């Protein structure tokens, strides 16, 4: 599967599950199970319930996703940026 086929979405973490998995509610209301991407795991980026995240999903399985970015209020890309 090529990277062009991935769907990028925004959501918020509603529950922290065992084994580095998270229950995420997307902005459109859909819920799915997501895991942290490789670089986030490598650099020990901590994700807590209530955090806003960006994630990638495969168009073939919309019940799973990979968290690629944790948004902090006032920093990073997105509408909440102060730049």
From Swiss-Prot:
Keyword Protein biosynthesis applies: yes
Keyword Zinc-finger included in the entry's annotation: no
Gene3D superfamilies referenced in this protein's UniProt entry, alphabetically: Nucleic acid-binding proteins
Subunit structure: Component of the 30S ribosomal translation pre-initiation complex which assembles on the 30S ribosome in the order IF-2 and IF-3, IF-1 and N-formylmethionyl-tRNA(fMet); mRNA recruitment can occur at any time during PIC assembly.
Protein name per its UniProtKB record: Translation initiation factor IF-1
Biological role: One of the essential components for the initiation of protein synthesis. Stabilizes the binding of IF-2 and IF-3 on the 30S subunit to which N-formylmethionyl-tRNA(fMet) subsequently binds. Helps modulate mRNA selection, yielding the 30S pre-initiation complex (PIC). Upon addition of the 50S ribosomal subunit IF-1, IF-2 and IF-3 are released leaving the mature 70S translation initiation complex.
HAMAP family: IF_1 (MF_00075)
PROSITE patterns on file: S1_IF1_TYPE (PS50832)
Gene Ontology molecular function terms on file: ribosome binding; rRNA binding; translation initiation factor activity
One Pfam family cited in the UniProt record for this chain: eIF-1a
Main location: cytoplasm
GO annotations of cellular component type: cytosol
Compartment(s) where it occurs, according to its Swiss-Prot or TrEMBL record: Cytoplasm
CDD domains: S1_IF1
Family: Belongs to the IF-1 family.
S1-like domain location: 1-72
Organism domain of life: Bacteria
Key words, A-Z: Cytoplasm, Initiation factor, Protein biosynthesis, RNA-binding, rRNA-binding
Alphabetical list of InterPro entries matching this protein: NA-bd_OB-fold (IPR012340), RNA-binding_domain_S1_IF1 (IPR006196), TIF_IF1 (IPR004368)
Family matches, as SUPFAM superfamilies: Nucleic acid-binding proteins (SSF50249)
